[in-house]
C-alpha cells in the first residue's frame, strides 16, 4: 500500500494516490509481475533494466483503498537518470508504504505539545486540507516549519473522544 507520491514526480503525474495497493508492476512492453509488499516492488524496480523502447513506461496495477476498483497507471520514465543506474521506487516518486497520520512522541515543550496535541492523535486535516498519510503529515509540518507562519487549525481524532477536535497550532521556524 503506497503513501502520497512526491510532487511533480512520475508517480504523481500518473495519478498514484495515497493508500493505493500495488497488485502487479512491470514495463509496458513486457509481462507484469505480482507484488506482495513494498520490498517486493522495490526489488522488482531495482532489478529491472531501463527499457530500450523509448515509448515504454513503468506500469502499476493498483487497487483502491476500498478494495473495489482496480486501475492501471503508466509512469513515464523520468528525465533524469537514476543514481548509479538503479531504478528505485524513489526515482519514480514513490515514497514508501502507507502509514496512518498518527502522532508519535512529541518534543517536550514543543509546538505540538503546547498546542494540546497528544501522542496517538490522528491528524485528519490541517487548514482544511486532508492529511491522507504520515508522509503528507511530515511534508506539511516541514513546510510550516521552514519559515514562521500564521497559526494553523488542525483537525484531529483522539482515542476515547467522539468526533474531531480542532486544535490551533502556531508553527515555529526550525533552524
Model-flagged regions — what are they?
Residues 1-175:
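PDZ peptide-recognition modules
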Amino acid at each position: 500500500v503506497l503513501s502520497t507520491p512526491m510532487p511533480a514526480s512520475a508517480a504523481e503525474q500518473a495519478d498514484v494516490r495515497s493508500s493505493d495497493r500495488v497488485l502487479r508492476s512491470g514495463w509496458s512492453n513486457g509481462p507484469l509481475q505480482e507484488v506482495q509488499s513494498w520490498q517486493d516492488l522495490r526489488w522488482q524496480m531495482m532489478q529491472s533494466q531501463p527499457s530500450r523502447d523509448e515509448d515504454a513506461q513503468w506500469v502499476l496495477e493498483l487497487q483502491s483503498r476500498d478494495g473495489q476498483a482496480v486501475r492501471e497507471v503508466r509512469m513515464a520514465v523520468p528525465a533524469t537518470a537514476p543514481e548509479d543506474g538503479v531504478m528505485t521506487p524513489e526515482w519514480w516518486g514513490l515514497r514508501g508504504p502507507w502509514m496512518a497520520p498518527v502522532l508519535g512522541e512529541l518534543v517536550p515543550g514543543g509546538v505540538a505539545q503546547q498546542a494540546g496535541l497528544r501522542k496517538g492523535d490522528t491528524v485528519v486535516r490541517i487548514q482544511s486540507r486532508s492529511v491522507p498519510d504520515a508522509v503528507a503529515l511530515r511534508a506539511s509540518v516541514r513546510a510550516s516549519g521552514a519559515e514562521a507562519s500564521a497559526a494553523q487549525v488542525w483537525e484531529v481524532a483522539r482515542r476515547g473522544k467522539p468526533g474531531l477536535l480542532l486544535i490551533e497550532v502556531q508553527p515555529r521556524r526550525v533552524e
